[in-house]
Design a protein with these regions (language model features):
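Positively charged n-region of N-terminal signal peptides that target proteins for export
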Residues: 1-4
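All-alpha RGS (Regulator of G-protein Signaling) helical domain and cognate RGS-like helical scaffolds
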Residues: 19-193
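Bacterial N-terminal signal peptides
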Residues: 6-15
Length: 193
């Protein structure tokens, strides 16, 4: 009986060691695509917001832009760290790195500004910059929400706790900022009449 118990104990211990040696992959390719995509997506938002001081943005737009830069930089750091920790490719935080991979033809990620829109925003100054910034950033944020919805629509995706929290935070933060920016844009339109 002792010998049998020792044998069972040895088998259980060796199974536990084998299981511990294999890291359970609790994420999907959709999770990786989402996290990697957010790096380029957020980099474009940071570039847009970074133009506020040099483009004559109003004080309220500058404050909004500072918040966007801080929040999205933090999320880029999270995304890069998560990808590294999971042995996945970490794309550069390049605002031009916004083409969806795996497509037969280049396609912008949801909400991303085209090169023409970026040039239009970069050329704008003062109240015109404010108006275009709000219009384009609302579009950009709506795209991030679409990316979250696409992730959550994939069976098995966002089961990893940090990814679920990240996607949820993106959804809540972007929705809140869209509401704020819509009010700001409406105020801007009223004041220019």
């Amino acid at each position: 009986m002792t010998r049998r118990f020792a044998l069972v104990l040895a088998l259980v211990a060796s199974s536990a060691e084998a299981a511990a040696g294999q890291t359970a992959k609790n994420y999907t390719p959709a999770d990786v695509h989402f996290v990697a995509g957010m790096i380029g997506h957020h980099a474009q938002a940071i570039q847009m917001a970074g133009w506020a001081p040099s483009h004559g943005a109003s004080p309220s737009i500058r404050v909004l832009c500072e918040r966007i830069v801080v929040a999205q930089n933090d999320e880029i750091v999270f995304a890069q760290r998560w990808l590294r920790e999971h042995g996945e490719y970490v794309p550069p935080a390049d605002p031009r790195g916004h083409i969806m991979q795996g497509m037969d033809h280049p396609m912008l990620m949801p909400g991303m500004l085209t090169p023409e829109q970026m040039a239009q925003l970069d050329a704008a100054r003062g109240p015109e910059f404010d108006r275009l910034f709000l219009t384009f950033m609302i579009q950009h944020h709506q795209g991030a929400i679409t990316m979250v919805q696409q992730l959550l629509a994939v069976p098995g995706a966002a089961q990893d706790g940090p990814i679920f929290r990240f996607a949820s935070d993106v959804n809540v933060d972007q929705t809140t900022e869209i509401n704020r920016m819509t009010l700001m844009l409406n105020d801007l339109k009223r004041s220019s009449q």
